[in-house]
Amino acid sequence: MKDTLALLQKFNAHPDSRCWYVAWNPKGTLLASCGGDRAIRIWGREGDSWECKTVLQDGHQRAVRKVAWSPCGNYLASASFDATTCIWKKKNDDFECLTVLEGHENEVKCVAWAPSGNQLATCSRDKSVWIWEVDEEDEYECVSVVNSHTQDVKHVVWHPTQELLASCSYDNNVCVYKEEDDDWECRATLEGHTSTVWGLTFDPSGQRLASCSDDRTVKIWKECQPGGGQDTAWKCVCTLSGFHGRTVYDIAWCPLTGALATACGDDGVRVFKEDETADPDQPVFSLSAHVPKAHSQDVNCIAWHPKEAGLLVSCSDNGEIAVWNYQSEV
């Protein structure tokens, strides 16, 4: 491995608490983090370091599991173990809680905005995925509840350009949803993992989906058209096994370089690179860079910067955020 993953900065983002998730705003000027302390922190770059700009701590009664920026960057959604999702509106340098989305019976595990910004998806330990629509008056309405999983739903992610949604679950499966006659339904179930699927990420084109699991593997799924007017199918074209020592909690496909990064329960951060000479229907990924003890505890999340190639952040059970620079020798 000639490629490098260098630590730029490490800071205690959520003291005495887990840092569950980090998310860049679309411009990459702000980073939101959330944790077991019920707080959301907004970080901005000051010179070469990242400083806390504001703390949002009145929205939730329990841990905040995930945060997500709207495509326009003016709204932040937060999903909490208190079974609610808060929508925060950015006003100058501050944020106000605009509305609270209620309805899930148990912890909300994830929230994600559609690329249009007009729809939002949430998922929960109650085994359901909810689709919400937002109008020009910032009113949110649940338009569909899908119960395609048989266990706790861990993560939801939207296709980068289409109104297509994917979710993954404690039931070991991935579901892909499309809207049909004003209702959302599961159009494909991706089976292959042997334990909980924790995270999902689309490649920049949206033609492939990567999943990561408690079975310590990463799977790459490719969309294929069966023809004859049938539904699109997703086929597993590659499995990365033998690289991770414990559960793989999160995975992120770099929108700029196509590199694939993982966050793992063995405290490591890894970056995989695709062999561009390989057959697209049989892709080959190699381990490009690995920091074995990126954090002193489980790594929960990994996120590539949307505008700066090679810049990525990770966060951990020890409350820390780490900023990394990945450099690949072509």
From Swiss-Prot:
Gene3D superfamilies: YVTN repeat-like/Quinoprotein amine dehydrogenase. Keywords: Repeat, WD repeat. It holds the Pfam family WD40. Component of the CIA complex. Disulfide bonds: none annotated. CDD domains: WD40. This is Probable cytosolic iron-sulfur protein assembly protein ciao1-A. The lineage of its organism: Eukaryota, Metazoa, Chordata, Craniata, Vertebrata. The keyword Ion transport does not apply. Key component of the cytosolic iron-sulfur protein assembly (CIA) complex, a multiprotein complex that mediates the incorporation of iron-sulfur cluster into extramitochondrial Fe/S proteins. Belongs to the WD repeat CIA1 family. GO terms for biological process: iron-sulfur cluster assembly; protein maturation. The keyword Repeat applies. Transmembrane segments: none annotated.
